[in-house]
From Swiss-Prot:
GO terms of biological process kind: ethylene biosynthetic process; fruit ripening
Tissue/organ expression: Expressed in roots, leaves and flowers.
Binding sites annotated in the UniProt record for substrate: E47, Y85
Induction cue: By indole-3-acetic acid (IAA) and cycloheximide (CHX). By auxin.
Enzyme Commission no: 4.4.1.14
Pfam family, one: Aminotran_1_2
Keyword terms: Ethylene biosynthesis, Fruit ripening, Lyase, Pyridoxal phosphate, S-adenosyl-L-methionine, Ubl conjugation
Official protein name in the record: 1-aminocyclopropane-1-carboxylate synthase 4
Superkingdom assignment: Eukaryota
Note: The stability of ACS proteins, and the regulation of such stability, play a central role in ethylene biosynthesis.
Post-translational modification: Ubiquitinated by XBAT32. Ubiquitination probably leads to its subsequent degradation, thus controlling ethylene production.
Length: 474
């Protein structure tokens, strides 16, 4: 066999993570209500299927956009030809307006500062190529999306240094943890080029607070060579939009728009989570740095968004009545679905981190661990995947420093499937509790037997000792 390149054969792609292994097991045995009711239910996929009816209704009412027409006339030939790498201006304008609407119109976005990419994965990698050299490092708060080990590192050669967090403060970013991560990178002789956050957080399902954002901005203001990348692809999934604060708002509110910090803050966005369109492969980089925009535009030729996709979505996003209703209804449905999962888990004795965004919950299964170790977490995860038949993501795949946390997705299935998943989890919890009761009872019987034996031995020793003394006295 001919030897492939080092890049093709290296193990830095991150695909060996339990996050991806769970997907592989699901693909071998996918659940289907009629064809395979005993199959694995996919709860490791952050996909939003709750508002497809709204999108389908819009398509039915807007046949020109759906059939690639303009005023009843076909634009097929126009769309079939090569397009400028910058993208269709109509789509970029509509996308920029949608980003502003998604953030409560508290900030505005210039479409000239947008670079279109084939999804957020491509956007994040392109930013790494623009901002860092191989061997440089980015600081990431933990826990973080497992795919970042592939997206940020594999082809770019960039290293990730974790900013550790814990459940004691709800996994919030602290100044101390940020500084410790920076010092750790320096000890490893790594040149830190930036910080990357997901806001709202994947996997936590929480929005980054004003306090946390100020900590980050204070840090990059003090350290002049460090960038801040905010992956905001879940901005449209916040149950209450006022709870989400974009980094662009901090720039505005902290009066940093006329400082050098402006050019070191970048946003990654997409329509995969907000509109539930991951198959359309629409992402973007937003930056105020013209050099970043220029370089990223050149690199975008390796992952363009098709003209047909841009044409269709420019019409959809330009329909303000639709987008306003969609965002409101999407938030409502996500909130209701998240509540069903949380209440269902609480009913069987499992708690979740309090969340206000995302397509998943950060679930605390520490009470189900046989020991407080990552080995015990993996044992539990394997049992859930292979026996319970649910694909969920273990916290260790997200680089969580505490064993026993799991990411569980809830928006990629119908209500009946969620109910079945909860039923399966209940059986797991019942089995674990029953097993522990039996173990406890066995242990108590064993301890009782030992106490009885020791009591008999003590009595025998006492009698023997008494008779010895009696003989001596005689």
């Amino acid at each position: 066999m001919v030897q492939l390149s080092r890049k093709a054969t290296c193990n830095s792609h991150g695909q060996v993570s339990s996050y991806f292994l769970g997907w592989e097991e699901y693909e071998k045995n996918p659940y289907d209500v009629t064809k395979n009711p005993q199959g694995i239910i996919q709860m490791g996929l952050a996909e939003n299927q709750l508002c497809f009816d709204l999108l389908e209704s819009w398509l039915a009412q807007n046949t020109d956009a759906a059939c690639f027409k303009r005023d009843g006339q076909s634009v097929f030939r126009e769309l079939a030809l090569f397009q400028d790498y910058h993208g269709l201006s109509s789509f970029k304008n509509a996308f920029a307006d949608f980003m502003s609407e998604n953030r409560g119109n508290r900030v505005s976005f210039d479409s000239n500062n947008l670079v279109l990419t084939a999804g957020a994965t491509s956007a994040n990698e392109t930013l790494m190529f623009c901002l860092a050299d191989p061997g440089d490092a980015f600081l990431l708060p933990t826990p973080y999306y497992p795919g970042f080990d592939r997206d940020l590192k594999w082809r770019t050669g960039v290293e990730i240094v974790p900013i550790q967090s814990s459940s004691t403060n709800g996994f919030r970013i602290t100044k101390l943890a940020l500084e410790e991560a920076y010092e750790q990178a320096k000890k490893l002789d790594l040149n830190v080029k930036g910080i990357l956050i997901t806001n709202p957080s994947n996997p936590l399902g929480t929005t980054t607070t004003q306090t946390e954002l100020n900590i980050l901005f204070d840090f990059i203001t003090k350290n002049k060579n460090i960038h801040l990348v905010s992956d905001e692809i879940y901005s449209g999934t916040v149950f209450n939009s006022s709870e989400f604060i974009s980094v662009m708002e901090i720039l505005k509110n902290n009066q940093l728009e006329n400082t050098d910090v402006l050019n070191r803050v970048h946003i990654v966005c997409s329509l995969s989570k907000d509109l539930g369109l991951p198959g359309f492969r629409v992402g973007a980089i937003y930056s105020n740095d013209k050099d970043v925009i220029s370089a990223a535009t050149k690199m975008s030729s390796f992952g363009l968004v098709s003209s047909q996709t841009q044409y269709l979505l420019s019409s959809l996003l330009s329909d303000k009545k639709f987008t306003k209703n969609y965002l409101r209804e999407n938030q409502k449905r996500l909130k209701n679905r998240q509540r069903k999962l949380v209440l269902g888990l609480e009913a069987i004795g499992i708690k979740c981190l309090k969340s206000n965004a995302g397509l998943f919950c950060w679930v605390d299964m520490r009470p189900l661990l046989r020991s407080k170790t990552f080995e015990a977490e993996m044992d539990l995860w394997k049992k859930i995947v292979y026996e319970v038949k649910l694909n969920i993501s273990p916290g260790s795949s997200c680089h969580c420093e505490e064993p026993g946390w799991f990411r569980v997705c809830f928006a990629n299935m119908i209500d009946e499937t969620l109910k079945l998943a909860l039923k399966r989890l209940k059986m797991l919890v019942d089995d674990e509790n029953s097993s522990r009761r039996c173990q406890k009872s066995k242990s108590e019987r064993l301890n009782g037997s030992r106490k009885k034996t020791m009591s008999n031995v003590s009595n025998w020793v006492f009698r023997l000792s008494f008779h010895d003394r009696e003989a001596e006295e005689r």
